[in-house]
A protein has these predicted regions:
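Conserved N-proximal alpha/beta basic substrate-recognition cap immediately N-terminal to
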Residues: 13-125
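Phosphate-binding site of ATP-dependent enzymes
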Residues: 157-241
Length: 316
């Protein structure tokens, strides 16, 4: 990559599988007359130095790395210091990724979530403050989830049944809060589970069938939405966007046997955007392409509105 020049949009990632997604964003940006630079771990040190020196500049940073890779946080800090627009800034990601916080916010907003018990971190409260009787409303088995340790079900216990299971899980990430959560059983018909993943990208909602057991996507068609009364799914994603304050995220929603839409996995702030055409468990290509198009369009709109460099810290 060139370490010199002025760019409208910088794309940063520490995950090699973001390559196809970034290629689509670059293509969409070019169609809108936006220049781009992609920053990978191998480029980070030189890029950061070039940005400090002023030999490399960008107006917007789409940062897929800083929340999980501390070495990228410095670049975001530098960008913030120069009042660049950051999509999405670290403080917004931290707020949205806290499952305990989102659970309470969702309930306050009238969204339906699984029955949940929230526990303080083991390090500060070794005694969970609950008894075996308190587990009864969760059913058996139930989930044990760290509130802030995210990505690929990291730290999640899928088949907990006892207080001993809870205590063992809490010791895995002793500085994190934990959620004990009932299993939501989705409606099933003709072998299809009514479990969905919704995507929010800069004011636009998309959704797909997503099997929580196989982790495979299937296109959700307008005919599906009409036939099964799935319109509320899209409104739920919009309401979550208003709560979490991210420009781009995904969420999981299940339609249960009682006809209720239940938000089962709150805000995925680091969406896996591998293409289905390249990976069996990837996201449908049409969704990924639309996200790329929405991102590029959002960047162009924000730059046009600001007249250049942004003084705004994050998405609203």
């Amino acid at each position: 990559m060139s370490l010199r020049g002025n760019f409208d949009l910088a794309l940063a990632s520490d995950w090699e599988y973001d390559g196809d997604f970034f290629d689509l964003i670059v293509d969409e940006a070019q169609l809108l007359g936006l220049s781009t630079v992609v920053i990978w771990p191998a480029d980070l040190a030189e890029t950061s130095q070039a940005f400090r020196d002023g030999t490399l500049n960008f107006r917007v940073l789409f940062d897929r790395a800083a929340s999980a890779a501390p070495e990228f946080a410095e670049l975001q800090s530098l960008a913030r210091g120069r009042e660049r627009l950051i999509l999405d800034p670290m403080e917004n990601l931290r707020w949205a990724s806290d499952k305990a916080t989102m659970h309470l916010e969702f309930l306050s907003a009238g969204l339906l979530a699984p029955y949940t018990v929230i526990l303080s971190p083991f390090r500060t409260s070794p005694d969970p403050g609950i008894s075996a009787d308190d587990l009864a409303p969760l059913g058996r088995p139930f989930y044990v989830k760290p509130a802030n340790t995210t990505g690929g079900s990291l730290g999640v216990v899928h088949d907990a049944e006892t207080l001993a299971d809870v205590e063992l899980a809490r010791r895995t990430y002793p500085d994190d809060k934990y959620l004990l959560q009932e299993r939501v059983v989705p409606r099933e018909r003709d072998g299809r589970r009514f479990w969905f993943r919704g995507f929010w990208s800069y004011g636009f909602v998309q959704a797909a069938w997503w099997d929580d057991r196989t982790h495979l996507y299937t296109e959700l068609t307008p005919a599906d939405v009409a036939a099964d009364g799935l319109e509320p799914l899209f409104d739920i994603v919009r309401r979550i966007a208003a709560i979490c304050r991210l420009g781009f995220f995904s969420t999981e929603v299940a339609l249960d046997g009682w006809g209720r839409f239940v938000v089962v996995d709150y805000v995925n702030e680091a969406c896996d955007m591998r293409l289905q055409s390249c990976h069996a468990d990837g996201v449908p290509d049409t969704i990924v392409r639309t996200v790329a198009r929405r991102l590029a369009g959002h960047v162009r709109e924000r730059l046009a509105r600001s007249g250049g460099f942004s003084t705004e810290g994050g998405e609203k």
